[in-house]
């Protein structure tokens, strides 16, 4: 992971996180590691087809997918 952080640090000053915030790669190595782990987990969940099945139904929603793991491309 250190090599990845080093490479990214040379290329960009900051990166967006899963929650919509910004991580400064120069100052926050631990946060970068944590966010990378979250992003990898989100991608693995998307690959496995995780959904919100069993959760409270929202009539306004056209699908039951996790908001942070969209399986469909927006129109």
Curated annotation (Swiss-Prot):
Residues 28-31 are annotated as: Interaction with BGLF2. One of its GO terms (cellular component) is host cell Golgi membrane. The keyword Membrane applies. The keyword Membrane applies. Myristoylation and palmitoylation (probably on one or more of the nearby cysteines at the N-terminus) enable membrane-binding and Golgi apparatus-specific targeting and are essential for efficient packaging. A lipid is attached at residue 2 (N-myristoyl glycine). Residues 53-75 are annotated as: Disordered. It is found in: Virion tegument; Virion membrane; Host cell membrane; Host Golgi apparatus membrane. InterPro entries: Herpesvirus_CEP3. Plays an important role in the cytoplasmic envelopment of tegument proteins and capsids during the assembly and egress processes. Also participates in viral entry at the fusion step probably by regulating the core fusion machinery. This is Cytoplasmic envelopment protein 3.
